[in-house]
C-alpha cells in the first residue's frame, strides 16, 4: 500500500503576520517621506513665485527710473508681473483657499494644499525724488499661525 503525502499549498498564519509587519514598517517610513516631498514641492513653487515677483519688481523699478528718473515699486507687487501666478486673487483678505495667492495690508499670502499659510511682508518704499526716497523691500517667508 502506497501512502501519498498531502501537499498543503498556501501561507501559514506566521508568514502572513510577518508580511503584514514588514508592510507596516514600510508604510511608516514611506508616508512621512511622501508628505515631506509634497511640502518641499509646495515650498519650491512658492520660492519660484517670489523669485518671479522679485525679478518683476527690479524690472518695474528700472522702467520707472528710465521713464521718471525715480526707481519706484508698485503698490501691489503682483502688478510688477506680466503674468499673475495661478491662484492669484484680488480678494482683500489673506489667502483662505488651497493654492490661493493674495495681497492685502502690505502682505503677500499663500495657502498650501495642507491649509498652512505663509506670508511675505512687502513695503513699496518711499516714493519721490528727495532724500527721503527709499526702495521697497520684500521680506522672508513667515508662517501664519491660525487660530483654533
Question: What do the predicted segments below correspond to?
Answer:
Residues 1-11:
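N-terminal leader/signal peptides at the extreme start of proteins
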Residues 109-148:
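Short, surface-exposed interaction loops/tails
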Residues 17-33:
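Alpha-helical hydrophobic helix detector
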Residues 62-118:
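Extracellular/periplasmic head regions of type IV pilus-like filament subunits
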Residues 8, 22-25, 54:
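Short glycine/serine/threonine-biased micro-segments
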Residues 39-67:
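Membrane-proximal N-terminal amphipathic helix
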Amino acid at each position: 500500500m502506497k501512502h501519498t503525502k498531502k501537499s498543503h499549498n498556501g501561507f501559514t498564519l506566521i508568514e502572513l503576520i510577518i508580511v503584514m509587519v514588514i508592510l507596516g514598517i514600510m508604510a511608516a517610513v514611506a508616508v512621512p517621506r511622501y508628505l515631506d516631498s509634497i511640502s518641499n514641492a509646495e515650498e519650491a513653487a512658492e520660492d519660484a513665485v517670489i523669485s518671479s515677483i522679485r525679478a518683476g519688481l527690479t524690472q518695474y523699478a528700472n522702467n520707472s527710473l528710465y521713464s521718471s528718473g525715480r526707481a519706484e515699486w508698485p503698490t501691489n507687487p503682483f502688478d510688477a508681473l506680466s503674468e499673475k501666478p495661478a491662484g492669484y486673487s484680488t480678494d482683500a483678505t489673506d489667502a483662505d483657499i488651497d493654492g490661493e495667492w493674495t495681497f492685502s495690508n502690505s502682505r503677500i499670502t499663500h495657502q498650501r494644499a495642507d491649509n498652512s499659510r505663509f506670508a511675505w511682508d512687502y513695503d513699496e518704499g518711499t516714493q519721490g525724488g528727495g532724500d527721503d526716497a527709499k526702495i521697497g523691500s520684500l521680506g522672508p517667508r513667515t508662517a501664519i499661525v491660525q487660530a483654533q
